[in-house]
From Swiss-Prot:
Membrane topology, record value: Peripheral membrane protein
Keywords: ATP synthesis, Cell membrane, Hydrogen ion transport, Ion transport, Membrane, Transport
Assembly and oligomerization: Has multiple subunits with at least A(3), B(3), C, D, E, F, H, I and proteolipid K(x).
Function: Component of the A-type ATP synthase that produces ATP from ADP in the presence of a proton gradient across the membrane.
Classification lineage: Archaea, Methanobacteriati, Methanobacteriota, Stenosarchaea group, Methanomicrobia
Protein name stated in the entry: A-type ATP synthase subunit C
Main location: membrane
Subcellular location: Cell membrane
One Gene Ontology CC term in the entry: proton-transporting V-type ATPase, V0 domain
Biological source species: Methanococcoides burtonii (strain DSM 6242 / NBRC 107633 / OCM 468 / ACE-M)
NCBIfam families documented for this protein: AhaC, PRK01198.1-4
Length: 357
């Protein structure tokens, strides 16, 4: 099974001998996108009990994943693993059917799942989580295979985990981990990922690499905004916030962010009115905010909306593919939030505020 194979990139921009097959992949993606759950399904799911929701998932596009994992897992754990497996299979398929520059760009973007899984494993070990609890959150949609990630989660110490990753690009950062500085290492991994993406499309020449660059830089803006809101609202000092800021944003350059860092929270909020993201968050943002869940949900929605609008303008480019990746990721996120929330008997309003619809 392809999911169980450790794959590597099939091409790079430096050895881009093969041409990209955008028309073929975008046609496949259109068909795949038709299988995504319509918006109107989520309110129905919110009115269902946990048994009805699990039955709905069993009868959906996730059926094969549920069936294959039913011998190993049950209950909510089964559906957590089924969602993660489906996401991994879906994104691995995109890599397998793409060629040339397109394959390279997709592969580089999906490295985020390598970092997600590595951080999940290290944080799980740090918090004393069981192997089963760690494996619930592993997603093998990047370049590290599922069996390899499982082998990492089964290791006893963080040192042995890092040693096993010595042949990867992540090792130079991971070897700085001493068992106490996990947050710092997680931040460095995130910065490494986005720096790598920025380097991938540095001085983009093709139209698709330019579109990809805009997509990535918008995502960096969204992440920086989320970081600024969260930390400034918590009263964190500007120097500490600056260490967590990602470079390469589209509308929020480092110079722009440096102007925002010293501002009190209320002035920071007012200063955002001149940026294009203000239109999406103006109805939510206040000078005093107890919770940022709704804001972060809206920022994610804004990112998806931006990609969707561009996908209609450039139908035979990388944009519809990135749009699909965002929407597929969001579908799994929404289903997971509903399942977890219902299983934990959370108030419906709390669950609803975390859904990106």
């Amino acid at each position: 099974m392809r999911l169980l194979q450790k794959f590597t990139r099939k091409s790079s921009l430096k050895q881009s001998g093969s041409s990209s097959n955008y028309a073929y992949v975008t046609a496949r993606v259109r068909a795949m996108k038709s299988n995504l759950l319509p918006r109107e399904v989520y309110p129905r799911l919110m009115n269902m009990g946990i048994d009805e929701i699990t039955r709905f998932i069993e009868e959906s596009q996730y059926k094969q994943d549920v069936d294959e994992l039913a011998r190993t897992y049950d209950g909510v754990d089964l559906f957590e693993h089924a969602l993660n497996r489906n996401l991994a299979v879906t994104f691995t398929k995109l890599i397998n059917i793409s060629e040339g520059e397109l394959n390279y760009l997709i592969s580089e973007y999906l490295r985020k799942y390598d970092i997600w899984s590595i951080k999940t494993i290290l944080r799980g070990k740090y918090c004393g989580a069981s192997v089963e609890e760690i494996n619930d959150s592993i997603v093998s949609a990047g370049q590290l295979s599922y069996p390899f990630l499982l082998s990492l989660s089964e290791k006893e110490s963080y040192e042995s985990i890092i040693d096993a990753l010595s042949g990867t690009d992540y090792y130079p950062t991971l070897k700085e981990y001493d068992g106490t500085n996990l947050s710092d290492i997680e931040n460095k991994l995130d910065k490494m990922y986005y720096t790598g993406l920025s380097t991938t499309v540095n001085n983009p020449k093709s139209n698709d690499s330019k579109l990809f660059s805009k997509f990535i830089r918008t995502e960096i803006d969204i992440k920086n905004l989320s970081t600024l809101f969260r930390l400034k609202n918590a009263g964190v000092e500007k120097d500490e916030i600056a260490d967590l800021i990602l470079e390469g944003g589209l509308h929020l350059s480092i110079k722009e962010i440096e102007k925002l860092l010293p501002l009190p929270f209320s002035e920071f909020v007012q200063s955002l009115e001149k940026y294009p993201y203000w239109e999406d968050i103006s109805g939510i943002v206040k000078t005093e905010m107890d919770s940022l869940i709704e804001l972060e949900t809206q920022l994610t929605r804004s990112n998806i909306k931006s990609a969707s609008s561009f996908s209609h303008v450039y139908p035979l480019s990388i944009v519809p593919i990135m749009d699909y990746i965002l929407n597929k990721t969001n579908e799994v996120h929404n289903l997971r939030i509903i399942l977890r929330g219902k299983a934990a008997n959370l108030d419906e309003e709390i669950i609803r505020n975390q859904l990106v619809i």
